[in-house]
Amino acid sequence: MSLLDRTQPPASGEIRQFDFPEVQTGALPNGLDLKICVLPRLPIVSVNLFLRAGEGSLVEGRAGTAVLTGDALEGGTLKRNGSSLAEALEGIGARLGVSTGWEGTSISVSVLADRLPEAFALLAEVTLEPDFPSVEVDRVREQQLAEIRQRSMDPSALASDEVSRRFYAEGLPYARPQVGTESSISSVTRDQV
């Protein structure tokens, strides 16, 4: 016998007050939009750069290329290879993230506030001076192909892809899988990334 009466929902606790901080907006001299949200209790800074270069901007034969490009960004820059980049980030306690969606690619870095200048320099290096070494592009391509093959055996992924195909008009990027197809990804070259 259980001590809990599962026929009755548990009593909820008091709702805690949360005052979301004001978002300040501005623009950098180069035209980039700037949004700042300060949480003074945390000594952490997160910088998120959003590029309007997503999967939705690609023609059908190049499906999945934006995702592959985003995933390969962490593979190195013109100044350092992927291992050196990872070591530089780890050395300052920073975390780099890249995420590609339909509308754009987000490149972000999170770090303690006193290490922001170094982290920001690394973010700029990754964004402005990517190298896309062939070995890294090949590795990411193989990972993406494995994901595509795995999705072909996943009923949930197949259902989602079918809903998208039926919901969106033929030829729209949203009607195809965001990660691409085996034929579109297997033919991607380093020069196309």
Over which residues does each language-model region extend?
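Scaffold signal of the M16-like zinc-metallopeptidase fold and its non-catalytic homologs
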Residues: 1-7, 76, 119, 151-192
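M16/MPP (pitrilysin/insulinase) zinc-metallopeptidase core fold and M16-derived inactive scaffolds
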Residues: 41, 46-113, 153, 176-177
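Hydrophobic face of alpha-helices
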Residues: 66, 82, 86, 120, ...
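Sec/Tat-exported extracytoplasmic proteins
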Residues: 69-77, 93-96, 127-134, 148, ...
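M16/insulysin-pitrilysin zinc metalloprotease superfamily fold
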Residues: 75-79, 110-143
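Short, flexible active-site-proximal loops enriched in glycine and acidic residues
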Residues: 94-102, 116, 132-138, 158
